[in-house]
Amino acid sequence: MFMINILSLIIPILLAVAFLTLVERKVLGYMQLRKGPNVVGPYGLLQPIADALKLFTKEPLRPATSSISMFIIAPILALSLALTMWVPLPMPYPLINMNLGVLFMLAMSSLAVYSILWSGWASNSKYALIGALRAVAQTISYEVTLAIILLSVLLMNGSYTLSTLITTQEHIWMIFTSWPLAMMWFISTLAETNRAPFDLTEGESELVSGFNVEYAAGPFAMFFMAEYANIIMMNAFTAILFLGASHDPHTPELYTINFVLKTLALTITFLWIRASYPRFRYDQLMHLLWKSFLPLTLALCMWHISLPIMTASIPPQS
């Protein structure tokens, strides 16, 4: 039975990832006044299936000088971690109701750094290594603000369990009470998932394709799927943290529809940002974090610590 539960979580995620690639190409196409993919199937709807067939039937070549075991383990680890992070997300009921769901998600997103580092190092290519080092520095840096923002939100929430956020936001969304945090969180998730304008790891002009430059066929597809699964997961997490949908136990489907629509809106915002903004320079990226976001998040964290203490004496309003 548990296997069916896992499959009922993984298969929709993989389908969503497949069609997100199509949505991205369509959105970028229309924003650049062109059609996007429109040959395979009606309106290009079968393009993701054609892409998957092409990638998984291709021969997976690898450089002769690469470290075989790490080269193969890295994409498997990336995809496994990307799918594992969905486990504690309440939609409205999580697959496993963890007591410390938020900490689990932070730990998993930190582990994802290893797959990037291994892939860059095992490829034995200088471009892949530079791309991997950039990705790791960026991911680790932005995780600092993500963790502090999460702490601030959870202090208002009163629990590390993600399901509690639904109850907390019954009356008002957290985005209204903590909008500076929500803005910084959204920008940090862009950086965390290596998306434009923070996609320095894939700077075509200097690094070809970044840490996955030596990958082809199946392993490349796994990295690609991991990246897009992470994008959807981060947007789902944002929707739970700041745009909590009201949950009626009698009609859980309404919560799910609400949640999916919010996640979709945030994901399309990601694509919109990609079409609109140029890439940051590396020093600007680091300055934004260490000189702007970190002091602000620390100050807001102090505020979120003191606010519940100050209001503790006020009796609850029924």
Swiss-Prot record:
<feature type="transmembrane region" description="Helical">
    <location>
        <begin position="294"/>
        <end position="314"/>
    </location>
</feature>
<feature type="transmembrane region" description="Helical">
    <location>
        <begin position="223"/>
        <end position="243"/>
    </location>
</feature>
<comment type="subunit">
    <text>Core subunit of respiratory chain NADH dehydrogenase (Complex I) which is composed of 45 different subunits.</text>
</comment>
<dbReference type="Pfam" id="PF00146">
    <property type="entry name" value="NADHdh"/>
</dbReference>
<dbReference type="GO" id="GO:0006120">
    <property type="term" value="P:mitochondrial electron transport, NADH to ubiquinone"/>
</dbReference>
<dbReference type="GO" id="GO:0032981">
    <property type="term" value="P:mitochondrial respiratory chain complex I assembly"/>
</dbReference>
<keyword id="KW-0813">Transport</keyword>
<keyword id="KW-1278">Translocase</keyword>
<dbReference type="InterPro" id="IPR018086">
    <property type="entry name" value="NADH_UbQ_OxRdtase_su1_CS"/>
</dbReference>
<feature type="transmembrane region" description="Helical">
    <location>
        <begin position="146"/>
        <end position="166"/>
    </location>
</feature>
<feature type="transmembrane region" description="Helical">
    <location>
        <begin position="171"/>
        <end position="191"/>
    </location>
</feature>
<dbReference type="InterPro" id="IPR001694">
    <property type="entry name" value="NADH_UbQ_OxRdtase_su1/FPO"/>
</dbReference>
<feature type="transmembrane region" description="Helical">
    <location>
        <begin position="100"/>
        <end position="120"/>
    </location>
</feature>
<keyword id="KW-0496">Mitochondrion</keyword>
<keyword id="KW-0249">Electron transport</keyword>
<dbReference type="GO" id="GO:0045271">
    <property type="term" value="C:respiratory chain complex I"/>
</dbReference>
<comment type="function">
    <text>Core subunit of the mitochondrial membrane respiratory chain NADH dehydrogenase (Complex I) which catalyzes electron transfer from NADH through the respiratory chain, using ubiquinone as an electron acceptor. Essential for the catalytic activity and assembly of complex I.</text>
</comment>
<dbReference type="GO" id="GO:0005743">
    <property type="term" value="C:mitochondrial inner membrane"/>
</dbReference>
<dbReference type="GO" id="GO:0009060">
    <property type="term" value="P:aerobic respiration"/>
</dbReference>
<keyword id="KW-0520">NAD</keyword>
<protein>
    <recommendedName>
        <fullName>NADH-ubiquinone oxidoreductase chain 1</fullName>
        <ecNumber>7.1.1.2</ecNumber>
    </recommendedName>
</protein>
<keyword id="KW-0812">Transmembrane</keyword>
<feature type="transmembrane region" description="Helical">
    <location>
        <begin position="68"/>
        <end position="88"/>
    </location>
</feature>
<feature type="transmembrane region" description="Helical">
    <location>
        <begin position="2"/>
        <end position="22"/>
    </location>
</feature>
<keyword id="KW-0830">Ubiquinone</keyword>
<comment type="similarity">
    <text>Belongs to the complex I subunit 1 family.</text>
</comment>
<dbReference type="GO" id="GO:0008137">
    <property type="term" value="F:NADH dehydrogenase (ubiquinone) activity"/>
</dbReference>
<feature type="transmembrane region" description="Helical">
    <location>
        <begin position="253"/>
        <end position="273"/>
    </location>
</feature>
<keyword id="KW-0679">Respiratory chain</keyword>
<keyword id="KW-1133">Transmembrane helix</keyword>
<keyword id="KW-0999">Mitochondrion inner membrane</keyword>
<keyword id="KW-0472">Membrane</keyword>
